[in-house]
């Protein structure tokens, strides 16, 4: 099971969309992929993203390479992942050692 593949559901871990879930739509090269939320579902626009900024999940939707947002949204609904995709992931921030004594 390859981690980075078309249809794989991922969590964005860097940038202003951090914590939101997205679906890989296309593989651009060995460092970049095309992802979408889609925007109507959770606000993530279709865009190019570095794979280092994604955390792949164990879920996958059946879409073809380069599928448009309507087809991705339909595949998410068929897989029963609509509510799952809307939920945001809150990252656990590490506590710096200097603040550990105050907690």
Swiss-Prot record:
GO terms for cellular component: cytosolic large ribosomal subunit. Keywords: Ribonucleoprotein, Ribosomal protein. The keyword Metal-binding does not apply. The keyword Ribonucleoprotein applies. One of its GO terms (molecular function) is structural constituent of ribosome. HAMAP family: Ribosomal_eL14 (MF_00721). This is Large ribosomal subunit protein eL14. It comes from Ignicoccus hospitalis (strain KIN4/I / DSM 18386 / JCM 14125). The gene is rpl14e.
């Amino acid at each position: 099971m390859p981690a980075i593949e078309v249809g794989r559901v991922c969590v964005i871990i860097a940038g202003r969309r951090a914590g939101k879930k997205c679906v890989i739509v296309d593989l651009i090269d060995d460092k970049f992929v095309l992802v979408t939320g889609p925007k109507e579902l959770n606000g993530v626009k279709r865009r190019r993203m570095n794979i280092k900024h994604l955390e792949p999940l164990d879920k996958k939707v059946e879409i073809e390479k380069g599928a448009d947002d309507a087809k991705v949204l339909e595949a998410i609904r068929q897989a029963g992942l609509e509510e799952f995709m809307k939920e945001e992931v809150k990252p656990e921030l590490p506590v710096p050692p200097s603040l550990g004594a105050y907690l």
